[in-house]
From Swiss-Prot:
GO terms for cellular component: large ribosomal subunit. One of its GO terms (biological process) is cytoplasmic translation. Pfam families: Ribosomal_L2 (PF00181), Ribosomal_L2_C (PF03947). One of its GO terms (molecular function) is transferase activity. It comes from the Bacteria. InterPro entries: NA-bd_OB-fold, Rib_uL2_dom2, Ribosomal_uL2, Ribosomal_uL2_bac/org-type, Ribosomal_uL2_C, Ribosomal_uL2_CS, Ribosomal_uL2_dom3, Ribosomal_uL2_RNA-bd_dom. The keyword Ribosomal protein applies. Part of the 50S ribosomal subunit. Forms a bridge to the 30S subunit in the 70S ribosome. Belongs to the universal ribosomal protein uL2 family. Residues 224-259 are annotated as: Disordered. It comes from Citrifermentans bemidjiense (strain ATCC BAA-1014 / DSM 16622 / JCM 12645 / Bem) (Geobacter bemidjiensis). Keywords: Ribonucleoprotein, Ribosomal protein, RNA-binding, rRNA-binding. This is Large ribosomal subunit protein uL2.
Length: 274
């Protein structure tokens, strides 16, 4: 993937950059693997806002992605590399030898015509899925399960990867994109390689309207509000908020640790650094 820049024909164009989409090989998705996607506007089932600054955006179709990689021992050929509006990574359409079709996250360097497989005896090459116990130490991996058979939950966004650091007992130690080192059961599956579209982080939105296309609404600063709306609100003229930074609900922010202890806490070998 490469980044495309524009001539400064307008203030919005001046700062804007975009993907060239040169790796995309198909315009329309596989119809059998597409669902309608209903937008929530950040509201829950009671109609109350649970995610602020969410709403609007272009209409999207949801592509059903195979995060379990549970179709084992059957090779599949990469038919297309496609754009997915619901995630930052690209997706790859697999045609299995028995005729079934599935989407997976497209790893870096995966191309049309390549063959991938989910197997304990699979080669260590991008796109193949194996249990952690079958993966050599130091291997770059992504799309990692936390619970056996639940489906991948870690290292799924564009350009991310994790690394298998050690194996001890029934757990493998995996260094995650955040810098956290975590113990994961050896029978959990992971996919070899790094997630594709690594230049996604270098794309500049360029203008407010493009954020609205993506379903992102304006984020208003607390000091610009009234006292009834935010702890930093009010005051005569411009103020600094008058206290240490807090969320709209009064919880300290900007560096304050808010993670509570959970049943999974003992599985964290080293805390995150990002």
């Amino acid at each position: 993937m490469a980044i495309k820049t524009y001539k400064p024909t307008s203030p919005g164009r001046r700062a804007q950059t975009c993907s060239t989409f040169e790796e995309i090989t198909a315009c329309k998705p596989e119809r059998s693997l597409v669902e309608n996607l209903k937008k929530s506007g950040g509201r829950n089932s009671n109609g109350r806002i649970t995610s602020r600054n969410v709403g609007g955006g272009h209409k999207q179709k949801y592509r059903i992605i195979d995060f379990r990689r549970d179709k084992t021992e059957i090779p599949a050929k990469v038919a297309t590399i496609e754009y997915d509006p619901c995630r930052s990574a690209r997706i790859a359409l697999l045609n299995y030898a028995d005729g079934e079709k599935r989407y997976i996250l497209a790893p870096l360097s995966l191309k049309v015509g390549d063959t991938v497989i989910s197997s304990e005896q699979a080669d260590i090459k991008p796109g193949n899925a194996l249990p952690i116990r079958c993966i050599p130490l130091g291997t770059i991996i992504h799309n990692i399960e936390l619970k056996i058979g639940k489906g991948a939950q870690l290292a799924r966004s564009a350009g991310t990867f994790a690394q298998l650091m050690a194996k001890e007992g029934k757990y493998g130690q995996v260094k995650l994109p955040s810098g956290e080192v975590r113990m994961i059961l050896m029978d959990c599956k992971a996919t070899i390689g790094q997630v594709g579209n690594a230049d996604h982080e270098n794309v500049s939105i360029g203008k407010a309207g493009r954020s609205r296309w993506l379903g992102v609404r304006p984020h208003v600063r607390g000091v610009a509000m009234n006292p009834v709306d935010h702890p930093h609100g009010g005051g005569e003229g411009r103020t600094s908020g008058g206290r240490h930074p807090v969320t709209p609900w009064g919880i300290p922010t900007k560096g304050y640790k808010t993670r509570t202890n959970k049943r999974s806490t003992p599985f964290i070998v080293k805390k995150r650094t990002k």
